[in-house]
C-alpha cells in the first residue's frame, strides 16, 4: 500500500468552511475528487484542489523513487482533515472610541492518499456481491 501525505498550513480560510469542502471528497478516488473540487463553488475548493494534486505528485515521486508501479486511478483519499491554525486578531473602530475584535481564522489542511490493500479490495468486493 502506497501512502502519500500533503499538508498546507496557514491558509486564510476558516476551518468550518474548509471542512465543508473536505467532507465532500473524503473517501473518494483522487481523480474524482479533483473533478468535484474543480467545479465546487466554495472558496476553499481551490487550495484543496491544489493540495490533492500535490499529494498525487508526491505519490508519483515516491513510487518512482522505490521503483514500483503506481496506477494513479487506484489512488483514493484515505484521510482528509482540517485543523485550526493561528488566528489573526484585528480591530474595527466603532462609535464612541470603542473597538470590536475581528478574528481572521486560518486552517491547516492535511490529505493522505493511499492505494487499496488486497484486504481492502476483498472486503469491498464482498460487500458489493451481497
From Swiss-Prot:
Gene Ontology MF, one: structural constituent of ribosome
Any single Pfam family the record assigns to this protein: Ribosomal_L22
Keyword field contains Ribonucleoprotein: yes
Record GO cellular component, one term: cytosolic large ribosomal subunit
Coiled coil: none
Keywords: Ribonucleoprotein, Ribosomal protein, RNA-binding, rRNA-binding
InterPro entries found in the cross-reference section: Ribosomal_uL22, Ribosomal_uL22_bac/chlpt-type, Ribosomal_uL22_bac/org-type, Ribosomal_uL22_CS, Ribosomal_uL22_sf
Single biological process term from Gene Ontology: translation
Subunit structure, as described in the record: Part of the 50S ribosomal subunit.
The family this protein is said to belong to: Belongs to the universal ribosomal protein uL22 family.
Protein's job: This protein binds specifically to 23S rRNA; its binding is stimulated by other ribosomal proteins, e.g. L4, L17, and L20. It is important during the early stages of 50S assembly. It makes multiple contacts with different domains of the 23S rRNA in the assembled 50S subunit and ribosome.
Protein name, as recorded: Large ribosomal subunit protein uL22
Organism encoding this protein: Clavibacter michiganensis subsp. michiganensis (strain NCPPB 382)
Amino acid at each position: 500500500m502506497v501512502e502519500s501525505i500533503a499538508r498546507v498550513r496557514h491558509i486564510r480560510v476558516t476551518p468550518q468552511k474548509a471542512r465543508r469542502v473536505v467532507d465532500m471528497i473524503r473517501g473518494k478516488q483522487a481523480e474524482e475528487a479533483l473533478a468535484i473540487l474543480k467545479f465546487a463553488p466554495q472558496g476553499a475548493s481551490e487550495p484543496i484542489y491544489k493540495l490533492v494534486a500535490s499529494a498525487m505528485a508526491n505519490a508519483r515521486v515516491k513510487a518512482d523513487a522505490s521503483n514500483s508501479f503506481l496506477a494513479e486511478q487506484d489512488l483514493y483519499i484515505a484521510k482528509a482533515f482540517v485543523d485550526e491554525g493561528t488566528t489573526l486578531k484585528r480591530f474595527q473602530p466603532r462609535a464612541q472610541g470603542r473597538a470590536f475584535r475581528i478574528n481572521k481564522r486560518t486552517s491547516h489542511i492535511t490529505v493522505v492518499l493511499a492505494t487499496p490493500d488486497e484486504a481492502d479490495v476483498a472486503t469491498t468486493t464482498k460487500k458489493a456481491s451481497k
